[in-house]
């Protein structure tokens, strides 16, 4: 045992003295700090701008759009005038032209209001929809009689009355917005609540979901504005609850399977916890964009890349380089058996990989604290059986690093197996790095999900690596809560992937042992 431990320490010494080790670990640390600084600069620039108002460039763009619409409007009016003067009696064309006229006049009124009140229409302001509804309703009322000449008088008057009532409500909200933005948002939500309650075509359960959604918006009304992320989250929560109520997939209108229902229940629990716990509403700036989860994900991706490359190079040369230099013979003639020599090399590489991951974790935490301490550190929120739970930010980050270590270990063992079988450093390192980059490309592009629907995809190694999203399916506050993240690329379950990786590692380790023990070393 003492001799084995001595061999293990000797292997550790060899690894630590390699110049590539120092270089790649240094590059990893520098890259994390550099990426952090760039992200910090971008955030500071973002926070220095008021995206609810327009700058001079935006204003000029809107004015140019308005002029273009006015020119188009004049052309349409000329065509309508020609039809009404008897130059063209095509009533179908006249009907289409009046509808175009409504749309263009509505757009001009909409742009006028935005320019007059300096509102940025390119942001997701709730007031934007009110502005647009009012503008188009005003144009519709103006030309309603021309477009709907075939209507019965009572039906016509009822429709006009309904449109005017809606337009008057929108106008009240717009006028209130100039005086008190928070009060305007509450008034807007009150009108929506009244419409929901008076709608006899929806069920009581559906109405409750919609009313609850409005109540959340009212609760998180910050001076008349709701953050984009929060608003999207509330809308996504409402959409998921409606899907669950109707037992229907939101994507393709098919009935939900049992597993999909369970997943949807957990998603709803996570979304409600994020919103109702106030994760979006703290005193830290820009906290609603999930800065902590975004930057940690970026840090782990970049640093994990360098750790993987480092371990591939070290493992890919651990046997082949010693065979080529002849230094392996001094180990072979020692009293230790070959399987113990190979085991010592695996343990030394594994220890060094863990050491690199610890450096990676420390670097990430220190950089995050140094550059982003003013931003909210949100815990990971998960759910089991419809009940949400929290996981400490630092523990969650540590677990993410360890999960990244699974990928590192798989590629490390692959490189070591090739080094043992081929006894060629260039081949083992080159093939392993090519496989590593191929896996990154395939996983990031979700290629396996889209190229085929066959079961064979489950048995491709790349479909079972990169397990962060399988261990923590709600790891990104921004993406999950905004509805942009939907686990699209997951074609295997966590349990299947873990079993697959275990079998794969056993095969690679066995192949390496067999090759090292039974082949002659010249």
Predicted regions span which residues?
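Aromatic- and glycine-rich beta-strand/loop motifs that create alpha-glucan
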Residues: 1-28, 343
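Junction motif at the cytosolic side of a transmembrane helix
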Residues: 18, 421, 499-522
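Residue-level recognition of pore/gate-forming positions within transmembrane alpha-helices
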Residues: 28-32, 349, 433-437, 505
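Secretory targeting signals
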Residues: 30-93, 100, 104-107, 111, ...
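Transmembrane helix segments
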Residues: 37-41, 425-470
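Hydrophobic/aromatic residues in alpha-helical transmembrane segments
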Residues: 311-315, 328, 363, 414, ...
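Transmembrane helix boundary and interhelical loop/hinge segments in multi-pass membrane proteins
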Residues: 315-332
